[in-house]
Structures are given as structure tokens and as C-alpha cells.
């Protein structure tokens, strides 16, 4: 038994984990995503309207083996392609955008651990995930200068490490076994700390009240003198020592979620139009025969197809980079720009299609029992994370001035 296992096993959660499937290839990952998405679609409206958290659906995500699909094969993962990863999150988000968003932090965090972690750290964390445990992000902090500014601190007292602070936008923490917390080290640099969700001094509060993505539980995490295992402290300075495309990788998941929302809205648009009555002046038998409606549906379909194609193109480029031992600054910049281009179209597709759904569906589409507004609410809230106005700025600056975008999780 290693030191890290010995220390942590004494603090392991008492919760037992059900049998977890082992995904071995891309097709199995896609099949599993469809199964979870079908389950997530059941009761989606009720959960959204009553703010009921999708505990069973997220547990299904873990049991199907989806939590570790990008873990390297040498650690027992399938290491599926980025294209498959994006498709999986499209599928999940079409079923329920909340179920798509909740585990995306885990996928991104595992990538950071792959970059920063020692072999011992990676073996432990990856084995936990493959066993069905979940990792969530203690999110950014409120009332700071910007989303990167931290007040949470890691202190050393009598040779022991402690966390103190408060986080918000902590998507997935209500479902997690482990939390990833960013804090300021006593020496002044930023560290990522992994702590047990049930550790003394941690309080997870489901106070998220956004009008969209209502059941992501993206609320508060309070940290009061939480003792930290020094074996699970990661120095974020390691992220900048060599070029990495971690930002593009993280953003790829956000794009996939937006595309999934757009696909769900488009499907409901077609269904709703078929049930709608035609406008009097149209002089047609069905609303689906209206000339202007046909034109709008055509535009929406093109927009959605473009978003999907750009997402696939960006994912395929990341797959090319995965085959390289090292990447250059130029390749990292291109990755961020390709994902940013996909993000712009995914943003527009999710918002425009979900809005047109209500317009083309007519007055009945506004009735609360249909809950058709959920797609627009989800799209509007999720697209606020990383506004496309800055994506467009980065894209223009790249092509016009040869300026490389910043390196962080938002580009």
C-alpha cells in the first residue's frame, strides 16, 4: 500500500459504489451515452420545473463507465477520441442539458491532473474515477475582481495543511465524492487541492437559483479549516511550463453542451410545428406547410449543421494533437481558435433555435405544462459562462494580427 492510499483509505467515503462498467472503445462510450441520455430524458420536465436534482441520472453516468472515458489506457481508461467525447456530451445534453453539464468539470479536471500529477497521484485519482467515484469543481468565487481571482487559502499549521474559503458556481458538488478546490498557497502561487466531499469543515449548499440549468446544483461550497492531504496538492505552475491545449479541451465540452441544447430545441421545434395551427392568411392546411415557417426551419437546420461540423472539426484537430509528444504554441493557438469558432455557432444555434421554437409553435408553446422554454433558459444560462463576444475578438485578432489567444479554461 502506498502512502497516498494509506492516508486516504482512512478517510474514504462510507458510501458504496455499484458495479461500474468498463468502457473499452469509442463505440461503447457512444452507446453508454445514449443509454444515459434516454434515462435523463425521462422526467426531465418535472425535474426542471421542481428543481429536483438528477441523482439517479448522474449515478447512471458513473455506472455506465462514462466518467473515465478519457483516462489513458495505461491507467485502465479507454482514452476515447475527442470527437467521441464531444459526441457523448452532445448526446447527454440533448437528453438533459443539466446532466450534460454536471460531469463536464470532472472530465476537464482529470485532464489537469494528467498534466500536473505525479504517477502516484494519477494512479490514485484515476482508479477512484474508474471505480465510479465522482470529482467536482469547487467553482469560482463571488465578489472578486474576476473569475480567476482567489480568496480561498491553503495554510500550514503545525505541519498540517488547511483550506479556508468559499466557492460558488460549484457545479456537480452535490453529486461528488471528491472536490477540486483552487487556493492560494502560502508561497503565493495557485494550487489545486483534492479533498474528500465528506471531510470535516466542508459544507455544500444547493443555493443555485439560476433560471436555466436549474438542476446542476451550481451553488456554494464553504471551507472551514478543512484538513488537506499534502499528497493531493497540485501545483498549477506546472500548467504553464510547456504548451498545452487544456483550454481548448475544456471549451470543447462547453461547445458540445450548447450543441446538445440546440439539437433538443430543434427536435421540439419540428414536433411543435406539426401540432400547431396555421396562420389564417397562410391559406394552407397545416402549419408545417406555411412558406415562412419552412424558410425559418431551413435556416435553423443549416445553423445547427454548421455548429455540429465545426465542433467535429475542432475535436478532430485535438485528436491530431493527442498523437504528438509535444505541441507548439502555434498548434495550441490553432486549437483554441477552432474550438472558439465552433463555440460561436453553437451559441447562436442554441439561442436562436430555442427562441424560434416558441415563435413557430404559436401561443400554445408558451403554456407551462409543455415546458418548452427550458431550452432557451438552459441555453441562455450556459452560454453566459464564456461569452462569444470575446471568442469573436480572439478569432479576429488571430487571423488579422497573428495574435495568439490567452491560455486559460475560457479559450
Segments predicted by a language model, with ranges:
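Glycine-rich beta->alpha junctions and the first turn(s) of the following alpha-helix
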Residues: 210-305
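Generic structural signal for well-ordered, non-transmembrane alpha-helical segments
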Residues: 34, 260-263, 298-305, 340, ...
Amino acid at each position: 500500500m502506498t502512502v497516498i492510499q494509506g492516508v486516504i483509505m482512512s478517510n474514504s467515503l462510507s458510501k458504496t459504489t455499484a458495479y461500474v462498467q468498463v468502457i473499452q472503445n469509442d463505440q461503447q462510450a457512444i452507446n453508454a451515452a445514449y443509454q444515459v441520455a434516454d434515462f435523463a430524458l425521462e422526467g426531465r420536465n418535472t425535474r426542471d420545473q421542481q428543481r429536483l436534482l438528477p441523482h439517479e441520472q448522474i449515478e447512471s453516468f458513473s455506472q455506465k463507465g462514462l466518467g473515465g472515458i478519457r483516462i489513458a489506457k495505461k491507467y485502465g481508461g479507454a482514452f476515447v477520441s475527442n470527437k467521441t467525447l464531444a459526441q457523448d456530451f452532445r448526446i447527454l445534453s440533448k437528453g438533459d442539458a443539466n446532466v450534460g453539464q454536471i460531469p463536464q468539470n470532472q472530465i476537464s479536471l482529470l485532464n489537469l491532473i494528467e498534466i500536473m500529477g505525479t504517477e502516484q497521484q494519477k494512479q490514485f485519482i484515476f482508479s477512484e474515477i474508474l471505480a465510479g467515484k465522482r470529482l467536482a469543481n469547487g467553482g469560482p468565487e463571488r465578489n472578486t475582481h474576476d473569475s480567476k481571482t482567489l480568496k480561498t487559502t491553503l495554510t500550514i499549521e503545525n505541519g498540517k495543511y488547511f483550506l479556508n474559503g468559499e466557492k460558488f458556481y460549484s457545479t456537480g458538488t452535490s453529486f461528488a465524492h471528491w472536490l477540486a478546490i483552487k487556493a492560494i498557497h502560502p508561497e503565493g502561487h495557485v494550487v489545486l487541492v483534492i479533498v474528500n466531499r465528506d471531510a470535516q469543515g466542508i459544507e455544500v449548499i444547493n443555493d443555485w437559483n439560476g433560471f436555466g440549468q436549474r438542476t446542476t446544483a451550481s451553488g456554494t461550497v464553504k471551507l472551514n479549516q478543512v484538513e488537506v492531504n499534502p499528497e493531493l496538492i497540485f501545483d498549477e505552475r506546472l500548467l504553464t511550463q510547456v504548451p498545452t491545449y487544456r483550454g481548448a479541451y475544456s471549451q470543447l465540452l462547453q461547445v458540445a453542451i450548447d450543441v446538445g441544447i440546440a439539437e433538443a430545441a430543434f427536435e421540439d421545434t419540428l414536433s411543435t410545428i406539426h401540432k400547431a395551427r396555421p396562420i389564417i392568411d397562410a391559406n394552407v392546411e397545416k402549419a408545417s406547410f406555411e412558406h415562412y415557417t419552412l424558410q425559418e426551419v431551413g435556416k435553423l437546420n443549416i445553423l445547427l449543421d454548421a455548429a455540429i461540423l465545426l465542433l467535429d472539426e475542432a475535436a478532430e484537430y485535438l485528436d491530431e494533437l493527442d498523437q504528438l509528444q509535444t505541441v507548439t504554441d502555434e498548434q495550441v493557438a490553432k486549437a483554441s481558435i477552432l474550438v472558439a469558432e465552433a463555440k460561436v455557432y453553437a451559441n447562436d444555434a442554441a439561442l436562436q433555435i430555442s427562441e424560434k421554437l416558441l415563435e413557430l409553435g404559436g401561443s400554445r408553446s408558451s403554456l407551462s405544462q409543455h415546458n418548452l422554454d427550458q431550452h432557451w433558459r438552459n441555453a441562455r444560462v450556459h452560454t453566459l459562462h464564456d461569452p462569444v463576444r470575446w471568442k469573436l475578438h480572439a478569432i479576429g485578432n488571430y487571423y488579422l494580427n497573428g495574435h495568439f489567444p490567452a491560455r486559460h479554461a475560457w479559450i
